[in-house]
Amino acid sequence: MHDILDLDRYPLDQPGSEGYATLVERCRRALDTDGLFNLDGLVRESVLDGIVAEVAPYLRDYAFTHSRRHNIYFLPEVDGLPRSHPALTEFDTVNHTVCADQIPESMVCRIYEWPPLAAFLADVMEKPVLYTMADPLARANVMAYHDGEALNWHFDRSEFTTTLLLQAPDAGGDFQYRQGLRSDSDPNYDGVANLLEGRDRAVTTLPLAPGTLNVFKGKNTAHRVTPVEGDRDRIIAVFSYYEDAGVMFSEAER
């Protein structure tokens, strides 16, 4: 894995070492403060073109085009909110997805399945263990966003999301988030409305370079990817890890 990942800078394969402990502590602090952490340049720049070249034919010829109009909650309605409430404003999300079962021998899947990565994430999250997902489709996806396409405002349903940016677009495709917009006890619908209507000045734009692993707690932090601009796609891998072994999605969840 040393030929793919910069394990000199990020010693994920050396648990118990001082460098590993320092990295885990740094990532924990970032999660507590910012709700996310990045391992910038985890994937070596020298192999990024090769990774993209592996998945590009599948994205071109076999990707599933996911096009959906949705609100920030991914729900048809929210108890106590009229349909006209601005917190239920709808947006379009479009991307093109290749699933792990289509690229089982790819470097993307090798990275996802590499045991030290899941062990490192578990240490940062202070969990006993994290497992790769058993679902052959949902465990790891590669998504492409073409010119004009975006992942619009939403809250995540899972505790955390792990992504690996493989290719940045010519312009646009920026990751934006609004930390602490709601809590488990306060949905803050008026605050959500302010965000969606463009009045929230606390939105953060996070520049991500190809090769960056990003771990993000998005359950109560609204986030989006702005529309891509230009002929160069935004290509990103999404990795799913769980505290329970053998997790599968239902047909409806897929």
Model feature map: region roles:
Residues 161-164, 215, 231-246:
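A short hydrophobic beta-strand segment most commonly corresponding to one strand
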Residues 43-44, 50-54, 58, 82-135:
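Signature of the catalytic double-stranded beta-helix
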Residues 56-67:
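Cytochrome P450 catalytic domain signature, combining two hallmark sequence patches
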Residues 1-33:
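Fe(II)/2-oxoglutarate
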Residues 101-109, 116-213:
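Catalytic core of non-heme Fe(II) oxygenases with the double-stranded beta-helix
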Residues 151, 222-229:
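Short beta-strand His + acidic residue motifs that chelate non-heme Fe in jelly-roll/DSBH
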Residues 41, 218-219:
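Conserved "cap/hinge" positions at secondary-structure junctions
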